[in-house]
Amino acid sequence: MSEESDSLRTSPSVASLSENELPPPPEPPGYVCSLTEDLVTKAREELQEKPEWRLRDVQALRDMVRKEYPNLSTSLDDAFLLRFLRARKFDYDRALQLLVNYHSCRRSWPEVFNNLKPSALKDVLASGFLTVLPHTDPRGCHVVCIRPDRWIPSNYPITENIRAIYLTLEKLIQSEETQVNGIVILADYKGVSLSKASHFGPFIAKKVIGILQDGFPIRIKAVHVVNEPRIFKGIFAIIKPFLKEKIANRFFLHGSDLNSLHTNLPRSILPKEYGGTAGELDTATWNAVLLASEDDFVKEFCQPVPACDSILGQTLLPEGLTSDAQCDDSLRAVKSQLYSCY
């Protein structure tokens, strides 16, 4: 008998092995840092991230989740947990609270976060309500451009716009570059009417701002507002009480003065609609990026929520603004506030 046939005869096949004898499945690939050397340095200086301690820090956060929230349905992958550590400058306790808030917000606002996928928001994406500019600013921040005038309230409720914003942020935060550099928001309020502005009352404002500040692992480095009408004073009066001082100081109101905008965002990265040299505003490219991510969003946001997740508190629900009647009263107050701007 040949050596080959003897080998075949004496080597057990996988099918013949008992369950206990089966080789263990291969472990998923570990975290591989995609940051450039410059971004590694930036993360060290600004976020207290030390490459030599990175995986130790991730494991520490993972252990805290397992110990303090054993029933929390969440990813514990290195890359996912790093988002929260970076957003809280590697403070374990604050990163853990941010992670819990992130999931609590998703549970407490199902109108926004349930079934959150690009195909469910085709109308919003087609409207041009928001996009991400193709070029980053000098600090490496992606620029999210929001244009409320593109929204027609009779077509769909304001919560669909909010869903599109969170969809975009979820996609952006997958990038380690964005986790380190953060984002900039460019909001164009040209043509926003009183009736349209009244849809953004305190109930919605507090929830959106609460999530962005305390329930989402994103670093908002600046908010540039252009072409704001007089009623924006009323809109900002609604928003400001909910803003932390650090975030409030990052709001810049430029009016129609594009030269003022260009001192912060160079013309080379802006479309011609904002006095830039980067061509016309392109919404199709970013829409295509989102639509190509459909499967990822279905996996993350379109699955049944485990019953055990009900242990999460409603940590960021606006106090005293939970009933429909209270929301109506709030909107009446908003309209009075906005009328006073005229």
UniProtKB/Swiss-Prot annotation:
InterPro entries: CRAL-TRIO_dom, CRAL-TRIO_dom_sf, CRAL/TRIO_N_dom, CRAL/TRIO_N_dom_sf. Keywords: Transport. It comes from the Eukaryota. Pfam families: CRAL_TRIO (PF00650), CRAL_TRIO_N (PF03765). Residues 1-31 are annotated as: Disordered. Disulfide bonds: none annotated. May act as a protein that binds a hydrophobic ligand. This is Alpha-tocopherol transfer protein-like. The gene is TTPAL.
